[in-house]
Amino acid sequence: MDKFLITGGVKLEGEVRISGAKNAALPLLAAMILADSPITLNNVPNLKDVNTLVKLIAGLGITMDYEGETVKADTSTLSNQFAPYELVKTMRASILVLGPLLARYGNAQVSLPGGCAIGSRPVDQHLKALEALGAHIEVENGYVHATVDGRLKGADITFDMVTVGGTENILMAAVLAEGTTTIRNAAREPEITDLAQMLIEMGAKIEGLDTDTLVVTGVESLHGCEYSVVADRIETGSYLAAAAITGGRVKTTHTDPSLLESVLDKFEEMGAEVTRGEDWIELDMMGKRPKAVSFRTLPHPEFPTDMQAQLMAVNVIGRGFATISETIFENRFMHVPELSRMGANIQVEGNDAIVTGVEKLQAAPVMATDLRASFSLVLAALVAEGDTLIDRIYHIDRGYENIEAKLQSLGAKIKRVS
């Protein structure tokens, strides 16, 4: 199993190109199922989760051509509506094929998903909403069997809790439903807006983008289009955090500063100089040790839970102390024991972590537990004294494209070992 060997103590400097967002690419790939003519998706990141979903969609009989950063799909060859456990088990996002398959073909059989071990993340919100649209759903032997007679019917749906995947699944189902569907308490993440914009390019009628109420007027069919995946705001924030923790200066390009304001505000509070351009962000820590800053994770546009672990890592070597409150996912402090092994001073009390900054971290063998937590260990290793070995880095490969090449280009001493 691959590991990262990182030698700390290098101030990162340079420029890094940001990839397309994994969290946008996955629903956009699922939405290709809805197109009745060829469709092209550009700026697709080369990641394990993306490859898995492309494989899953190809397994439905759809012709998939994946080359470089471009995926082309032709749904005219579809032969079945079955998403098997072997592919679904590694990734939660595979449940996103449920809505499009059901809406377009009236039938879907999808295994219950796997993916990161963060909290319960139940799919019951997806299923309840699909039933409201007229679907008949049975869950047996670990599979969701969904059918509908004729077309799905528009409905007024209110999610019990904010669910990104649920919003995406129902949005994709509603675009081909008969009549109007109103989705209330919808998630407002930029990746959902990206999905809605591609669906509109395909001929869908959607109002209320960037709000918590989406109104969808169903159409009979959607056509293909050419579309580009939005920049990855979490990858952007992660590389800026690498500059902050090492006292360096990093410019991220091919990104969108407007999607990351809550995080950039925190970097500025830490003492960094942040410069924004139209499609770039530069963070200069000017060799200083960052100031520890408190924050609370909340749904977009507030501070994203997917940046919690990275900002905690920066706080670990910060001046002073900070309280970090995680309100989105339970069980999302799994990186704390690993950071503590490197000398971090962190106390966890329920959904709060109290971080008292230390001047130095020591290298230690550590283990990645989930996607974002694993990047926090990379950040800590970049400033630790000595050589840190990070195990289970397959978690990192699920969400960061060419991570070692990108970090090496900034001066980091990182290599992949087995």
Swiss-Prot record:
User: Looking at the record's lineage, which domain of life comes first?
Assistant: Bacteria
Q: Which Pfam families match?
A: EPSP_synthase
Q: Which GO terms describe its cellular component?
A: cytoplasm
Q: What keywords are assigned to this protein?
A: Cell cycle, Cell division, Cell shape, Cell wall biogenesis/degradation, Cytoplasm, Peptidoglycan synthesis, Pyruvate, Transferase
Catalytic residues, chain numbering: C116 (proton donor)
Under CDD domains, the record lists:
UdpNAET
Where are the 2-(S-cysteinyl)pyruvic acid O-phosphothioketal modifications?
Answer: C116
* Reaction(s) this enzyme catalyzes, per UniProt: phosphoenolpyruvate + UDP-N-acetyl-alpha-D-glucosamine = UDP-N-acetyl-3-O-(1-carboxyvinyl)-alpha-D-glucosamine + phosphate
Query: From the Swiss-Prot or TrEMBL record, what is one GO molecular function term?
Result: UDP-N-acetylglucosamine 1-carboxyvinyltransferase activity
Q: Where does phosphoenolpyruvate bind?
A: K22, N23
Q: Which family does it belong to?
A: Belongs to the EPSP synthase family. MurA subfamily.
Protein's recorded name: UDP-N-acetylglucosamine 1-carboxyvinyltransferase
Q: Give the species.
A: Acinetobacter baylyi (strain ATCC 33305 / BD413 / ADP1)
Designated gene of the protein: murA
